[in-house]
């Protein structure tokens, strides 16, 4: 299975269609796109009511109402729906993605599924930080324990709560021993 998972916030929900449309136009279609929307937000007074959520005609899109885990809701909101031996691609709600994103991630996942991939990886010390804004592809087998990590290490620390790319990468590198590799050289050029 290939999943794409993202979240949104009240201020950006009106822009969600652009991101979703780009995901539906992928050269390799994901099997499921999760849009994880908290019932209420820790950072905002506003809420997203059911009638504010855009309606999508495509059956691969699933809206998941969930608790607010900050930007990490893009992963944690649908975590219990992800099957083993699958690829989950984290995306942001305010980006339109190139039509080859899913295909490239799946290609590299098929070759070396023990790695995680992003089109841009920010170096920090000995490990890289995958970027959801550029797509962040992870083998679902390596997510066992990440919710507990979030609950015990991240949830109550504002410094981490807002930086999902950092704590997800930290978990993958230090707890699951995954390399997080950049696919920057594999961006299409001149097309």
What function would you assign to each model-found segment?
Residues 36-86:
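Active-site-proximal specificity loops/subdomain of glycosyltransferases
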Residues 85-96:
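Short beta-strand-to-loop acidic/aromatic patch adjacent to the donor-nucleotide binding site
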Residues 1, 14-19, 155-191:
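C-terminal catalytic/acceptor-binding lobe
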Residues 19-31, 39-40, 52-55:
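Short, acidic, metal-binding catalytic loop of nucleotide-sugar glycosyltransferases
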Residues 99-124:
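Conserved donor-nucleotide/metal-binding helix-loop-beta segment in metal-dependent transferases, i.e.
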Residues 129-151:
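Conserved nucleotide-sugar donor-binding
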Residues 2, 24-35, 59-61, 86:
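Short loop->beta transition adjacent to catalytic acidic/histidine clusters or analogous donor-positioning motifs
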Residues 1-25, 34:
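N-proximal low-complexity "stem/linker" segments adjacent to membrane-targeting elements
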């Amino acid at each position: 299975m290939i999943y794409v998972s993202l979240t949104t916030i009240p201020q950006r929900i009106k822009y969600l269609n652009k991101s979703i449309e780009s995901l539906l136009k992928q050269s390799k279609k994901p099997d499921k796109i999760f849009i994880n929307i908290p019932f209420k937000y820790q950072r905002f007074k506003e809420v997203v009511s059911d009638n504010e959520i855009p309606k999508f005609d495509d059956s691969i899109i699933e809206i998941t109402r969930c608790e607010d885990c900050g930007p990490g809701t893009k992963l944690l909101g649908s975590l219990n729906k992800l099957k083993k031996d699958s690829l989950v691609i984290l995306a942001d709600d305010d980006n339109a993605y190139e039509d080859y994103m899913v295909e490239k991630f799946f290609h590299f996942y098929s070759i070396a599924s023990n790695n995680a991939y992003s089109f841009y990886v920010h170096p920090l010390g000995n490990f890289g930080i995958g970027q959801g804004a550029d797509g962040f592809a992870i083998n679902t087998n390596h997510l066992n324990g990440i919710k507990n990590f979030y609950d015990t290490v991240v949830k109550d620390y504002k410094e981490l709560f807002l930086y999902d790319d950092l704590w997800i990468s930290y978990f993958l590198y230090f707890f699951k021993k995954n390399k997080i590799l950049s696919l920057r050289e594999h961006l299409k050029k001149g097309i």
